[in-house]
Every structure is written in structure tokens, then in C-alpha cells.
Curated annotation (Swiss-Prot):
Main location class: mitochondrion
UniProt source species: Bos taurus (Bovine)
GO CC list: mitochondrial matrix
Binding residue positions for ATP: 524-531
Protein name: Lon protease homolog, mitochondrial
Residue interval of the organelle targeting sequence: 1-67
E.C. number: 3.4.21.53
Family: Belongs to the peptidase S16 family.
Domain Lon N-terminal: 125-371
Amino acid composition bias (Basic and acidic residues), ranges on this chain: 245-257, 784-801
Lineage per the UniProt record: Eukaryota, Metazoa, Chordata, Craniata, Vertebrata
Protein purpose: ATP-dependent serine protease that mediates the selective degradation of misfolded, unassembled or oxidatively damaged polypeptides as well as certain short-lived regulatory proteins in the mitochondrial matrix. Endogenous substrates include mitochondrial steroidogenic acute regulatory (StAR) protein, DELE1, helicase Twinkle (TWNK) and the large ribosomal subunit protein MRPL32/bL32m. MRPL32/bL32m is protected from degradation by LONP1 when it is bound to a nucleic acid (RNA), but TWNK is not. May also have a chaperone function in the assembly of inner membrane protein complexes.
Catalyzed reactions per annotation: Hydrolysis of proteins in presence of ATP
Pfam families associated with the record: AAA (PF00004), Lon_C (PF05362), Lon_lid (PF22667), LON_substr_bdg (PF02190)
Gene3D superfamilies: 1.10.8.60, 1.20.5.5270, 1.20.58.1480, 3.30.230.10, LON domain-like (2.30.130.40), P-loop containing nucleotide triphosphate hydrolases (3.40.50.300)
Length: 961
């Protein structure tokens, strides 16, 4: 034994000479060679439990030491109690110690399963808080501690041969900290554990602990800090030699106190030590119920072990621990609960239960849940394993089949099959020579690459795109004008300019015998059918249709593709279009070209320059394909709401076609022909169930949908029919007829109620005409005297002023100042005695101040309003005008003539004044728009003055006579 490992551990465990002397005597007076590092260094005696209780990790060594202890006591040798006489007796004559030991005969046979001696009462324990699973008695658990104060306390306890602690479960499973600031954070019932092994991991301490019994916390204890070890060593070196009695007295008086128990409240801060008491279970009788529960627990444990072999080691450890667990209901209940993976509060309930039958019942409930979970896991495991086996078997069979086919010559290699597939695609296509050279080169490179390399997949994808382009493949176009016109008229009402341009394109293609691509741009307000007419054009021409939107696009790669060097690279939209349509002459709609963005990845509008240039797109170069592609036969149609935001070079490459808004009559026709039938079909109705008359549609257009397009009108019609469907299904009515009287029940109150602000215009107020996104509208200009004019030339400043309000833009403000200057000059020529505009302070306002207004077309209207105020005469009633006026009075042309004319007619105007250069725009309007209107085309403002103030003209003529 002297040279064995067990003796070395025993020697190290005996931390004072009082404990080492009997060991030395039993070993024949020889200190083990491997144990010389354990020589005493001023350690104090320990009055704790017997030393072998420290060595749970070496039960054989502990058993051997206990045998020496008992043999020494029987022979009368030196005791382990630390008595001085006994110690000397055992040390002075090593032979007598050995003889005494031999005289008593050999000690009892000690095995690895000999139970360790644990103190029955140990009230003061370090507190270790754990999460998720509590420690049950007779079970081992690995615990890690990071709290530095607690680590130091545990080391000190083990150093003093008191390797015991209390392990308690935290109430909050999410609290990973091992610092306990309040006893309310933990359950008060825990386990008294013995520390078997400690491993220092730097920032934390890992321990193997074994539970022994249940304990309950009484209160918190305060820990007194230990003196530094360096000071103790210095004191020991300076100690003079003293007698035995002095040493005993000094040892008794200077023994360190580690725990201070005070009657006051618990100290604030961390809880490191607690006072505990043992928890005793209630007395019980082994009744039939207990026997039945015990038997059922044993059966369930065996079932779980049969399903899950991972539990066998834990159960065998309990079975070999020196007691028959199956005969002890107390241990059996703990083992049953510890084997489960139940919730922490359920395990704590088992730990706190003192009634053994109830504890057995709770443990059995947890075991049953675990058994069901184990069965489910086993079933899922079998299913997964079966699937894996099937997949593996299928893979093996497929590989064998490939080899067999290859040996028989029935199947070619993967690379050969890929090459054959690509060449098969190109057989029916007219591939240009430069493209075919690239294909051959890539196929040769593909044959040299490994199937599993990344370059192989990149090359294969490139060849897939390159061979998917419809080289030389066209769709048969329809060059029949009558059929094309019928298709266009069938799908859309109005839009004569667009239809005429498409028919012209067909006529030119018919005369040439071939078609060429064109780039058209339809611009106009929202909802007028720009996008939908493109689909109808594709149907009329019998071309494939492809649409993509560039609104908000900021990446050039969306149009021209990515370089092949990028991961996941792919071609741009145009190449994708050719692959999808499988023709070289599709109709491509580029939507919202006026809303294209610009970002750090480039300017997409610049990328469109090459695409939409007829001279360049015959050799369009995509970044991904890197070979020229012919797009000269593609018909490009772009759509936009406004043209100002389209870059000038891009606008120059497109043929701009204006798609103006619809008038009320056109909207009514569209609603009756298209919108109402479509909405009826969408709502599951027919004419026998719901009826909308023309009067209802007219009222909808007039009071709810004044915008240029028909999208809002479509929404309102669908709303009416949805409510009609609800009434029919709910049983309120079998037939719903919508009339002008009950229209508000379906769509709510009217949005537009007043056509014009003034039925009779007073002096200083003139009706103008304006263009808006919703079409045209009337715009009144009001003028008023801001303060009385100064008639005394000797006092004050005779020069007047003009204040402008109504949220006007800069252009309109400049137009107002020009009109004010011209009006003063014109009035001086017309009536030199009238100084009103020279000396008065005038306020000019354009109503509806919340609506921003801008543009130069109100110049004539402002001049007329100022002159009306100065002459104190109203203008001709039911008169409206538009036109920009220069500083010399020349009337300049403006835009939006159609919308403004429609607005004037809707407001009941009978006479309108337009610039002479807008005569061509007016005569392009439909007859039903211009019918009933008196139109005057003017070049100078003098003509407008004669029209607006006929009385002034009559007076002037009378004076001349």
C-alpha cells in the first residue's frame, strides 16, 4: 500500500500530522515516494468528519484508509481524534504501531461500494444555486460555479476537510447567474451534497457533487473573510518552541471562525452561507398502495430502459450503490424523478414532498410522461431511419443502374448528355457564327471540368442561357389592317392617336414585306389605358407580350445583366424576355419610364439609351452573355405620366404619343361597354339581378369620378355591384336597381358638388381655365382693394402695390407681376385719367389656397381681373379664358386645351378665349366637345379686352363717331 495510488491520495487527504501519523504507522513508517509533495506546511488539525469521507472519487482508497482506522483503534494505537498522547504513541515507535495493528488481526474487507461516512447534522452550508434540475439524494451532478466569492468559500471548506454544500434550485430557469442576492430567488428545500472532485477552469470552478439528504433553509448566514495565507506563514515562522499544553491552548483559542450567526436581519448582498436543517419524511407503512406504486415505478423504469439505453448506466449506478433500491420506496421515488426530463417545478415538487406515497405517485406520473416521450422518440427514430435506408437503397440501385446502362451502351456520361442536350437545342435555330464559336469553346471547356466543381455549374448555366435564346426565330405577324383595327376597337374606346399609329406601322410593314422594331412612348394621366393598350397591340399584331417596370429601378444590372464572375449572376430583363417569349420579335412594354431611379450601382436610364436606340440595339451586348444580340425587330412601348422627368437623350430616342384623358361622354361609353360587364362578372351578377342605368353612371362620373382616367370609375362601379350582391345574398332584395335617388346608399356622399364658385361674376373676378392631374378645371382669379388709395399727392407715396396669395408657384407669381405691370400700362393708354392701379394697394387671390398652383397660363385672366377692378365693371358673364401674356401684351400659347375646354363646358361656359397658336389643338377635339361653344382666338390682349368688356368697346366706338 505504501507505494500505491490509494496511499498517495490518503496521504494528501490527511492535511495535518495528527491524521498522518496513524497512516505512517500503518504503512511501516515509510512516506510514499509519490506523496512527498504532501508534507505538512503548517496546516492546522481538522475536527471534521473522518478523512475517507473526502475521497468519493477513489472508493478503494477510502475503504483502505477506513480499515486502517478501525484496525488502529482495536490495537490501541494512536487515534485519529487528534489527542496528543495518542499521536505520540503512534509515532514514537513505528514497529509497535504495526505490531498493534497486527495483534488485532486484519481489518474488515473493504470494497469500492463501501458507504462513506457523512455527518448526520451539518447546519452551516455554502449555498450553490442551480437551474433546470435539482440534485436528488444518491445522485451525482456536475456543478459549475463562477462567483469568485463562492469559489473561494468552497475552496476554503474543502481545505478544512468540510467538502459539503447545499444545492438549491432557482425559481427562474432563465436566470443563469450563480449569484443569489435574496433567498426568495430559490426554493428553500434542497439537497445536502458532498463535493467529490474539484477542477479549476480559471474563471470558474467545476465540481462533481453527490446528494445525500434533503435539507431546508432556516436563514442566511454571514461569511467572515479569511486572513491571507501569507500572514499565517510569517506568523508560523516566527513562533518560538512551546510546550504541549501551550500548543493545545493556543490551538483552541485561535481556531478560525468562518460563520457569524446573528439574531438580526440578513445582511444585504450575496447569499453565500445558509443555516439548514434536515428534512425528515413522514412515517409510513408499506401498504398495498405503496407496494403497487413501487412495482409500477420499477416496471416503468424497465420499460424506459428497454426503449432508451441511455438510462441504463444511471440505473446500474443506483443498483450497485450498496442498497436494493427496488426495496426502498424513498430511494425509488428519487430515482424515478431523477431519470425524467420533466419541468423544473415538477421535479422540485417531488423533492419537497415528505409524504412517501404521494412522492411515489408524483414520481410515477413523471415516469409515465417520460415513457410516452421515449416511445414517441423511438417511433420517430424508426421512421427517420427507415427513410434514410430507403434513400440509401434507392441511391445504390440508381448507381448500379447507371453502371449497367453504361456497360451496355444505353446511357452516356453526364457531360456527353449535357453537350448533346445543348446541341439539340441549336439544331432548329439560325445561330450566328460568332455565337456558335462561343458555344463550341464553352462546350470544350465543360468537358475538361470536374462535375462537382463550381466552375462546371457556372459554365453549364451560361450554356443553358446561351442556347435558350431564340436565334433567328420569329412569330408570324398579322399585317391585316381590318383585323388589327377590329381588335383595337374591341378592347379600347377612344385613343385614336394610338390606334392610328399602330395601323400606320402595320401598313408600312405590309408595303416593305418585313417588319422593323419601333420605340413608342405613351404618356398621359393615370388610368387612361396606356398599359392595357400595349397588350391589345400585341394581340392585334400577333406578337408575344412581355412587360417589366422600371419604376424605382436603381441597378443597371436589371437591364444589362451581371458579370459572370459574380455568384448567382444572371442576364438582364431583355435576355430574360427573349428566353420567355421564344421569339426575336416580341412586344416589350417598359412601364413607368418616367419614374426610373438612380443609385450607386449606376443610372438605368443611361442603360436604356443603348436598348432603345434603333441604330445600336441590333448589336445589344448583355453583360452576362457577352455576345451581341439582335433586338432590331422588337417593338418597344414605354409608358409615362409626365415627360419632364424623362432624360432628354432618352426622350429623343422615342416617338412620343399623348394619351389624353377622357371626357364625360367617353367615360360613359367605356363604363357601359367594358366596366359594368366586367364588374358584373366579377361579382357573380347579371342584368336580371342588378341594373345600373346611364343616368346613374353619368351621376357617378359627374359627382364622384372627375379624374382623367377611368380607374376610379371602375372602383365605384365595383363598389355599387358588391353592395348589390350583398343585398341579394342577405335576402334584402331579389333584384337591385340603382337609381340617381338611391346612389348615395351605395357610394356615399358626393365628392364634387359645386361646378363653379360664382354664378354671376362681380367686378374684379374673372374665370380662368387650368389643367390638373384629374383633367381640367375652372380657376377663378379674385382682386380686391387692400386699403383706400391715397388721393392727396402731397402726402404719402402715390405708387400702389400688389399682394398675391393662394399658394402660387414662382412661375405664377412672376406671371402676376407681369400682368400687373401690363395692366397699369394698358389702363394709362385706355383711360389716362384713371390712376387706380397706380395709386391703389391691391390684393390678388386664387381660391382653394390648400391646392398648389403654378404655370404661366393665367396671365390673361389676371390682367382682365385687374382691369375689371380698376374700371369697376364686371366682365362678360359665362366667359372663361386662358393664355400667357407677355410684358407687351402678346398672348402666348399654352397646353391642356382639351382638358380646359371640357372643364369650361362642364361649368356651363358659353364663350372661351384661347391663344391664336392653339387653334390647331382646338380643332383636333371631337365635335361633341366643341359643340355650343363660342371660341375666340386672340394674338394680343386688346382683343381680349374688347371681348370681356363689350360696353367699353361700344363707348369707344361712340366717341370715335
Amino acid at each position: 500500500m505504501a507505494g500505491g495510488t490509494g496511499c498517495v491520495r490518503l496521504w494528501g487527504a490527511a492535511r495535518c500530522w495528527t491524521l498522518r501519523r496513524p497512516l505512517l504507522a500503518a504503512a511501516g513508517g515509510r512516506v510514499p515516494t509519490a506523496a512527498r509533495a504532501w508534507l505538512p506546511r503548517g496546516r492546522r488539525a481538522c475536527d471534521a468528519s473522518p478523512p475517507w469521507a473526502l475521497w468519493g472519487q477513489s472508493p478503494a482508497a477510502a475503504g483502505h484508509w477506513r480499515g486502517l482506522w478501525e484496525a488502529n483503534n482495536r490495537s490501541g494505537g494512536g487515534a485519529f481524534s487528534g489527542g496528543e498522547d495518542a499521536s505520540e504513541g503512534g509515532a514514537e515507535d513505528g514497529a509497535s504501531g504495526v505490531g498493534g495493528s497486527a495483534g488485532g488481526g486484519e481489518g474488515p474487507v473493504i470494497t469500492a461500494l463501501t458507504p462513506m461516512m457523512i455527518p448526520d447534522v451539518f447546519p452551516h452550508l455554502p449555498l450553490i444555486a442551480v437551474t433546470r434540475n435539482p440534485v436528488f439524494p444518491r445522485f451525482i451532478k456536475i456543478v459549475e460555479v463562477k462567483n469568485k466569492k463562492l469559489v473561494e468559500l468552497l475552496r476554503r471548506k474543502v481545505h478544512l476537510a468540510q467538502p459539503y454544500a447545499g444545492v438549491f434550485l432557482k425559481k427562474d430557469d432563465n436566470n443563469e447567474s450563480d449569484v443569489v442576492e435574496n433567498l426568495d430567488e430559490i426554493y428553500h428545500t434542497g439537497t445536502f451534497v458532498q463535493i467529490h472532485e474539484m477542477q479549476d477552469l480559471g474563471d470558474k470552478l467545476r465540481m462533481i457533487v453527490m446528494g445525500h439528504r434533503r435539507v431546508h433553509i432556516n436563514r442566511q448566514l454571514e461569511v467572515e473573510p479569511e486572513e491571507p495565507e501569507g500572514e499565517n506563514k510569517q506568523k508560523l515562522r516566527k513562533k518560538p518552541k512551546r510546550g504541549k499544553k501551550e500548543a493545545e491552548e493556543d490551538g483552541a483559542t485561535k481556531r478560525p471562525l468562518e460563520v457569524v450567526v446573528g439574531p438580526g436581519p440578513s445582511p444585504a448582498g450575496e447569499v453565500l452561507m445558509v443555516e439548514v436543517e434536515n428534512v425528515a419524511h413522514e412515517d409510513f407503512q408499506v401498504t398495498e398502495e405503496v407496494k403497487a406504486l413501487t412495482a409500477e415505478i420499477v416496471k416503468t423504469i424497465r420499460d424506459i430502459i428497454a426503449l432508451n439505453p441511455l438510462y441504463r448506466e444511471s440505473v446500474l449506478q443506483m443498483m450497485q450503490a450498496g442498497h436494493r433500491v427496488v426495496d426502498n420506496p424513498i430511494y425509488l421515488s428519487d430515482m424515478g424523478a431523477a431519470l425524467t426530463g420533466a419541468e423544473s417545478h415538477e421535479l422540485q415538487e417531488v423533492l419537497e414532498e415528505t409524504n412517501i406515497p404521494k412522492r411515489l405517485y408524483k414520481a410515477l406520473s413523471l415516469l409515465k410522461k417520460e415513457f410516452e416521450l421515449s416511445k414517441l422518440q423511438q417511433r420517430l427514430g424508426r421512421e427517420v431511419e427507415e427513410k434514410i435506408k430507403q434513400t440509401h437503397r434507392k441511391y445504390l440501385l440508381q448507381e448500379q443502374l447507371k453502371i449497367i446502362k453504361k456497360e451496355l451502351g444505353l446511357e452516356k456520361d453526364d457531360k456527353d448528355a449535357i453537350e448533346e442536350k445543348f446541341r439539340e437545342r441549336l439544331k432548329e435555330l439560325v445561330v450566328p457564327k460568332h455565337v456558335m464559336d462561343v458555344v463550341d469553346e464553352e462546350l470544350s471547356k465543360l468537358g475538361l471540368l470536374d462535375n462537382h466543381s463550381s466552375e462546371f455549374n457556372v459554365t453549364r448555366n451560361y450554356l443553358d442561357w446561351l442556347t435558350s435564346i431564340p436565334w433567328g426565330k420569329h412569330s408570324d405577324e398579322n399585317l391585316d389592317l381590318a383585323r388589327a383595327q377590329a381588335v383595337l376597337e374591341e378592347d379600347h374606346y377612344g385613343m385614336e392617336d394610338v390606334k392610328k399609329r399602330i395601323l400606320e406601322f402595320i401598313a408600312v410593314s405590309q408595303l416593305r414585306g418585313s417588319t422593323q422594331g419601333k420605340i413608342l412612348c405613351f404618356y398621359g394621366p393615370p388610368g387612361v389605358g396606356k398599359t392595357s393598350i400595349a397588350r391589345s397591340i400585341a394581340r392585334a399584331l400577333n406578337r408575344e407580350y412581355f412587360r417589366f417596370s422600371v419604376g424605382g429601378m436603381t441597378d443597371v444590372a436589371e437591364i444589362k445583366g451581371h458579370r459572370r464572375t459574380y455568384v448567382g449572376a444572371m442576364p438582364g430583363k431583355i435576355i430574360q424576355c427573349l428566353k420567355k417569349t421564344k421569339t426575336e420579335n416580341p412586344l416589350v412594354l417598359i412601364d413607368e419610364v418616367d419614374k426610373i431611379g438612380r443609385g450607386y450601382q449606376g443610372d438605368p436610364s443611361s442603360a436604356l439609351l443603348e436598348l432603345l436606340d434603333p441604330e445600336q440595339n441590333a448589336n445589344f451586348l448583355d453583360h452576362y452573355l457577352d455576345v451581341p444580340v439582335d433586338l432590331s425587330k422588337v417593338l418597344f412601348i414605354c409608358t409615362a405620366n409626365i415627360t419632364e422627368t424623362i432624360p432628354e437623350p432618352l426622350r429623343d430616342r422615342m416617338e412620343m404619343i399623348n394619351v389624353s384623358g377622357y371626357v364625360a361622354q367617353e367615360k360613359l361609353a367605356i363604363a357601359e361597354r367594358y366596366l359594368v360587364p366586367q364588374a358584373r362578372a366579377l361579382c357573380g351578377l347579371d342584368e336580371s339581378k342588378a341594373k345600373l342605368s346611364s343616368d346613374v353612371l353619368t351621376l357617378l362620373i359627374k359627382q364622384y369620378c372627375r379624374e382623367s382616367g377611368v380607374r376610379n370609375l371602375q372602383k365605384q362601379v365595383e363598389k355599387v355591384l358588391r353592395k348589390s350582391a350583398y343585398k341579394i345574398v342577405s335576402g334584402e332584395a331579389e333584384f337591385v336597381e340603382v337609381t340617381p335617388e338611391n346612389l348615395q346608399d351605395f357610394v356615399g356622399k358626393p365628392v364634387f358638388t359645386v361646378e363653379r364658385m360664382y354664378d354671376v361674376t362681380p367686378p374684379g373676378v374673372v374665370m380662368g381655365l387650368a389643367w390638373t392631374a384629374m383633367g381640367g378645371s375652372t380657376l377663378f382669379v379674385e382682386t380686391s382693394l387692400r386699403r383706400p388709395r391715397d388721393r392727396d399727392s402731397d402726402k404719402g407715396d402715390k405708387d400702389g402695390s400688389l399682394e398675391v396669395t393662394g399658394q402660387l408657384g414662382e412661375v405664377m407669381k412672376e406671371s402676376a407681376r407681369i400682368a400687373y405691370t401690363f395692366a397699369r400700362a394698358f389702363l394709362m393708354q385706355h383711360d389716362s385719367a384713371n390712376k387706380f392701379l397706380v395709386t391703389s394697394h391691391i390684393h390678388l387671390h386664387v381660391p382653394e389656397g390648400a391646392t398648389p398652383k403654378d404655370g404661366p397660363s393665367a396671365g390673361c385672366t389676371i390682367v382682365t381681373a385687374l382691369l375689371s377692378l380698376a374700371l369697376d365693371r364686371p366682365v362678360r358673364q359665362n366667359l372663361a379664358m386662358t393664355g400667357e401674356v407677355s410684358l407687351t401684351g402678346k398672348v402666348l400659347p399654352v397646353g391642356g386645351i382639351k382638358e380646359k375646354t371640357i372643364a369650361a363646358k362642364r361649368a356651363g361656359v358659353t364663350c372661351i378665349v384661347l391663344p391664336a397658336e392653339n387653334k390647331k389643338d382646338f380643332y383636333d377635339l371631337a365635335a361633341f366637345i366643341t359643340e355650343g361653344l363660342e371660341v375666340h382666338f386672340v394674338e394680343h390682349y386688346r382683343e381680349i379686352f374688347d371681348i370681356a368688356f363689350p360696353e367699353e368697346r361700344a363707348e369707344a366706338l361712340a366717341v370715335e363717331r
